[in-house]
């Protein structure tokens, strides 16, 4: 009796695990990742590298003198920052481009890290929220430097 009870429990557990993905509604499957509001008094910056770009060279992102992180392929990073202006740079294998941004409390902004001309350079380009959210949903998260302000 105990053996059959254990077998039934194991079978039901396996069935429940297998159905977990299928139990999501169409809305949940379509929405994907949740975009949390920035922390109180902070702004959220998303830095994204798109997978449609065939160039796989490293792009290093810095803010002032601090490294934010490196994007080697498709992925995204989120940085929560207090309101201020920031000097962001995207470094390719040969050079970099600067982008100075001003952020306000409560806002979320999206930036695309991409290769630029001449070859070996990289740049950050601000994109609209719907496009940024779509790209974030398609890519894995890459954790950024936790010691940033």
What do the PLM-derived regions correspond to, one by one?
Residues 1-17:
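Sec-dependent bacterial lipoprotein signal peptides
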């Amino acid at each position: 009796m105990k053996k059959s009870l254990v077998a039934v429990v194991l079978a039901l557990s396996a069935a429940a695990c297998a159905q977990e993905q299928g139990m999501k509604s169409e809305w949940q499957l379509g929405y994907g990742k949740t975009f949390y509001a920035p922390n109180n008094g902070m702004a959220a910056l998303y830095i994204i590298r798109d997978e449609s770009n065939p160039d796989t060279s490293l792009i290093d992102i810095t803010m002032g003198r601090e490294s934010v992180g490196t994007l080697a392929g498709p992925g995204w990073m989120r940085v929560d920052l207090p309101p201020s202006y920031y000097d962001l740079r995207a470094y390719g294998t040969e050079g970099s481009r600067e982008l100075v941004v001003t952020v306000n409390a409560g806002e979320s902004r999206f930036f695309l890290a991409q290769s630029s001309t001449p070859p070996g350079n990289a740049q950050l380009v601000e994109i609209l929220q719907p496009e940024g959210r779509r790209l974030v949903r398609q890519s894995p998260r890459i954790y950024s430097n936790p010691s940033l302000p």
